[in-house]
Amino acid sequence: MQFPMGPACIFLRKGIAEKQRERPLGQDEIEELREAFLEFDKDRDGFISCKDLGNLMRTMGYMPTEMELIELGQQIRMNLGGRVDFDDFVELMTPKLLAETAGMIGVQEMRDAFKEFDTNGDGEITLVELQQAMQRLLGERLTPREISEVVREADVNGDGTVDFEEFVKMMSR
């Protein structure tokens, strides 16, 4: 199932991407990276794990291939002790941010879309919230079975709801 999303906020347009690859990131881009990083730094120790990096990259709108994730994982394990701090994350992501083209979803757009579904603001999308959002946002009335199927596909941890990370994965398919 596809959900309509807004335009990208931090990725460069095709015409200027080549010229801009060597420029430093702007303050707004660094803040975008910081927001994304903090979303995945659950214990607030200033680090994210190697395994969370792929999900974090997807949150930012970058869709790494399996090979890229394997290579990054090896680099992180060898050079960074299996964990990435914010500075290392910026260093890893800067070339990707500068090289990507328009049409990708940024963290804020993803978070805004999630909030449209999570109407009570508790950080989880329930069956009822999904059904209401589909009707309100897309004009689609899904059956309870169809709603359950959407949640089941997205609900990685099996708790019956869709949290932000699961939402990002669902939107990345």
UniProtKB/Swiss-Prot annotation:
EF-hand domain: residues covered: 28-63, 82-99, 105-140, 142-173
Q: Where does Ca(2+) 2 bind?
A: D118, N120, D122, E124, E129
Tissue-wise expression: Retina.
Please tell me where this protein is predominantly located: cytoplasm
Where does this polypeptide localize? Cytoplasm
Which example biological process does GO assign this protein?
Answer: signal transduction
Q: Which Gene3D superfamilies match?
A: EF-hand
Q: Which GO terms label this protein's molecular function in UniProt?
A: calcium channel regulator activity; calcium ion binding
Task: Give residues annotated as binding Ca(2+) 3.
Answer: D155, N157, D159, T161, E166
Q: Which PANTHER family does its entry note?
A: CALCIUM-BINDING PROTEIN 1-RELATED, CALCIUM-BINDING PROTEIN 5
Instruction: Name the job this protein performs.
Output: Inhibits calcium-dependent inactivation of L-type calcium channel and shifts voltage dependence of activation to more depolarized membrane potentials. Involved in the transmission of light signals. May positively regulate neurotransmitter vesicle endocytosis and exocytosis in a salt-dependent manner. May play a role in the extension and network organization of neurites.
Complexes and interactors? Interacts with CACNA1C (via C-terminal CDB motif) in a calcium-dependent manner. Interacts with STXBP1. Interacts with MYO6.
The protein's name is Calcium-binding protein 5
Species source reads Homo sapiens
The opening ranks of the lineage are:
Eukaryota, Metazoa, Chordata, Craniata, Vertebrata
